[in-house]
């Protein structure tokens, strides 16, 4: 690997982005694609459109944890340009249909970094990279080929500028996927002298993934050679072939500076549907117009929030964060409405947009609540997608990827996500069916729930990560209870509300921590609240310091466990000042530490807002401003942990606007400390203007609040007031204050 300092690596990319001359009303100019490409951010780098099925970008040789998106700023290798990528996940997959332009004969393999001839890969220089929303460019040093990429929702458009060669080629790599992914069956066929098609079936995180494609070239190719990878591989005869791992070499003669365009459409259903997608979205070859359309699509979404600030770095961080919240969920259907369901069946011409990449354990906390504000037009489709997943697999999604349930992470995170849509009054789906899905998912006797129903909690001697699973189930039960109450189902409300209090079993009044409890009612010993052993203790990517606060649905009940507000507050204060040392084989996800508060991982994200809920909002303001200004940066390592499909950035977006939804569903956004002087947020019924008067780094404390010109004496703003639009005013000052009554 060619390692340099992060600042040097990113300089070329930043200059290239800034060298563009966008319109004065363009907000894409403030998106810095480098942010999150270093450290443990794991963000996607490449060309796409908002929520698109295609994420077209470079894929590097390494397959270790910091390369789950296929790209890391410390690396300068590329094996090709893949059409699917994940954004900020802690597990790798995808990288489907990887395309690599080459000159001369190559080895058909991923290759190793110690031997440039071991595969097709090439070095590139970050100084030659250009990246902005919907566009990516680089130069392949090994081949002297300039690469530019752009995309529509379902089509990737490649622009390759070749040197003179009688042996130029574009290679389709169907063998190499991402990290845990491996092909199970691949197919390539020649359709005519401009077109090839095929598919890639694979298994990995998504156990049965199927991506079909068709690819057209802007000039006739002179040859198609199909190679089989692996030890027994080699050239295969004919214009079509099916095997576990294939490469298709499409050959050309090129003159110096000649440009060849390649457009690749994908489908989860069939080659025929991939062709339909191409015909509908990209029938022509105008690269500049396609890139401009992608820029317009991104700008239209970014325009939903316009901020006023004199801090240029904060502006870049904000719009990059907003961009990151719209990479996924991604569309998982064709232009004719067809998609592949969780049961493996093809559903035809459905009347909604089907989505995938639901990282719900992460996103129910902030990314989904942000979506309900900024993307009301998408909420019926998101809800219908979840309901169809429920019908096909018998439960709401947990971590859904490419039509597959991965069951990744703990709890029932699809429940608060769907409940939030119901409680916020969204329509376009059957509310009774939604409640059925919520209830049945909450009653399914799997993943520790059978033990929970038997014992009233999940015993730590019978199930791994018992505390984490149970506490996530508890907050999901609360969400079910709120929907039951909304629909007049009193008995269900009482049942699920009581079950949502199961967290109390784990609270040890002696140590004042949540601890593992065995089937005989005994706390696990020995006990160390700083200790975390990844995948082998009572917590999930955390420890007792972090999980003790995972009761966002019943803060009053948690205060009661402590014996009152004074003891609760004292312990909460301690969280931020104790040692940040982690003991045991802790997960690297436990990052962004302030004391034992871990902003780099999701279970901590609501914790700073607990102060507002108990009448000490100045402490929320202190911590929110500290996190906004020290744990987010406009550098490659500008995120304190995994992006996690938009969650890390959604926290920034909401918190910088001045509020955050603490409870897992329902729409009370508690106040913190607005970062910007003014923000205009396009909402369901108009525009919400958020103004912070007398705002500065010193004047970070809310003194008073007005809503539509009238004094507002609540610690939160309700979703309905946000969605209605209007004017929310904060009067800021340098002294702590309380403007509300509890």
Language-model features: where?
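Accessory carbohydrate-recognition regions in carbohydrate-active enzymes
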Residues: 21-416, 422-471, 479-505, 511-514, ...
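C-terminal motif of bacterial Sec signal peptides marking the signal peptidase cleavage site
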Residues: 16-17
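Bacterial N-terminal signal peptides that target proteins for export
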Residues: 1-8
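ATP-dependent phospho-/nucleotidyl transfer catalytic cores
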Residues: 476
């Amino acid at each position: 690997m060619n390692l340099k300092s992060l600042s040097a690596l990113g300089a070329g990319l930043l200059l290239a982005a800034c060298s563009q001359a966008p319109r004065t009303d363009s907000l894409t100019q403030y998106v810095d694609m480098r942010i999150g490409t270093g450290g443990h951010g794991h963000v996607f780098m490449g060309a796409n459109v908002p929520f698109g099925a295609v994420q077209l970008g470079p894929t590097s040789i390494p397959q270790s944890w910091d390369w789950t998106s296929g790209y890391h700023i410390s690396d300068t290798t590329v094996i090709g340009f893949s059409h699917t990528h994940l954004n900020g996940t802690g597990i790798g997959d995808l990288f489907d249909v990887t395309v690599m332009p080459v000159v001369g004969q190559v080895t058909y393999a991923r290759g190793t970094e110690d031997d440039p001839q071991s595969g097709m890969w090439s070095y590139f220089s970050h100084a030659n990279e250009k990246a902005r929303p919907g566009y990516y460019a680089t130069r392949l040093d090994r081949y002297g080929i300039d690469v530019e990429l752009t995309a529509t929702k379902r089509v990737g458009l490649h622009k390759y500028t070749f040197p003179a060669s009688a042996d130029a080629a574009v290679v389709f790599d169907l063998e190499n996927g991402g990290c845990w992914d491996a092909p199970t069956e691949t197919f390539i066929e020649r359709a005519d002298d401009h077109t090839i098609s095929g598919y890639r079936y694979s298994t990995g995180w998504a156990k049965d993934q199927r991506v079909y494609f068709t690819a057209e070239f802007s000039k006739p190719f002179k040859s198609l050679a199909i190679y089989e990878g692996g030890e027994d591989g080699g050239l295969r005869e004919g214009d079509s072939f099916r095997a576990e791992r294939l490469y298709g070499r499409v050959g050309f003669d090129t003159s110096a500076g000649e440009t060849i365009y390649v457009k690749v459409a994908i489908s989860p259903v069939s080659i025929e549907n991939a062709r339909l997608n191409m015909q509908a979205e990209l029938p022509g070859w105008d690269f500049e117009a396609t890139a401009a359309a992608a820029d317009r699509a991104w700008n239209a979404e970014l325009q939903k929030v316009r901020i006023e600030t004199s801090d240029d770095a904060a502006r870049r961080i904000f719009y990059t964060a907003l961009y990151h919240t719209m990479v996924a969920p991604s569309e998982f259907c064709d232009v004719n409405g067809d998609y592949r369901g969780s049961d493996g069946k093809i559903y035809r011409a459905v009347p909604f947009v089907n989505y995938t990449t639901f990282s719900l354990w992460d996103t129910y906390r902030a990314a989904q609540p942000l979506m309900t504000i900024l993307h009301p037009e998408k909420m019926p489709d998101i809800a219908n997608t979840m309901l169809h997943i429920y019908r096909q697999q018998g439960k709401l999604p947990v971590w859904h990827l490419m039509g597959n349930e991965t069951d990744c992470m703990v709890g029932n995170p699809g429940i608060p996500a769907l409940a939030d849509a119901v409680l916020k009054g969204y329509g376009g789906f059957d509310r009774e069916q939604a409640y059925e899905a919520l209830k049945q998912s909450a009653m399914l006797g799997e993943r520790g729930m059978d033990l929970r129903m038997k014992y009233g909690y999940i015993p730590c001697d019978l199930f791994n990560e018992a505390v984490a699973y149970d506490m996530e189930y508890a907050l999901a039960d609360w969400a079910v209870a709120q929907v039951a109450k909304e629909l007049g189902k009193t008995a269900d409300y009482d049942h699920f509300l009581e079950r949502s209090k199961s967290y109390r079993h784990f609270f040890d009044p002696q140590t004042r921590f949540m601890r593992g409890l065995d089937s005989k009612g005994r706390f696990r010993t020995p006990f160390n609240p700083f200790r975390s052993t990844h995948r082998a203790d009572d917590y999930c990517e955390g420890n007792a310091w972090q999980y003790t606060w995972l009761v966002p649905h019943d803060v009053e009940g948690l205060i009661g466990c402590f014996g009152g507000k004074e003891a609760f507050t004292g312990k909460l204060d301690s969280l931020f000042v104790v040692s940040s040392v982690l003991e045991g084989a802790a997960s690297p996800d436990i990052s962004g530490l302030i004391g034992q508060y871990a902003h780099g991982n999701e279970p901590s994200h609501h914790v700073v807002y607990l102060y507002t809920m108990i009448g000490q909002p100045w402490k929320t303001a202190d911590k929110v401003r500290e996190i906004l200004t020290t744990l987010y940066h406009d550098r490659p390592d500008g995120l304190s942990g995994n992006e996690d499909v938009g969650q890390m950035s959604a926290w920034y977006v909401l918190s910088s606007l001045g509020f955050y939804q603490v409870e897992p569903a329902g729409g009370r956004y508690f106040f913190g400390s607005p970062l910007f002087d003014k923000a205009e947020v396009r909402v369901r019924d108009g525009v919400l203007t958020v103004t912070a008067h007398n705002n500065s780094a010193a004047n970070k404390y809310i003194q008073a609040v007005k809503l539509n010109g009238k004094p507002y004496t609540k610690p939160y703003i309700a979703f309905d007031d946000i969605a209605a639009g209007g004017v929310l005013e904060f009067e800021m000052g340098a002294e702590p204050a309380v403007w509300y009554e509890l």
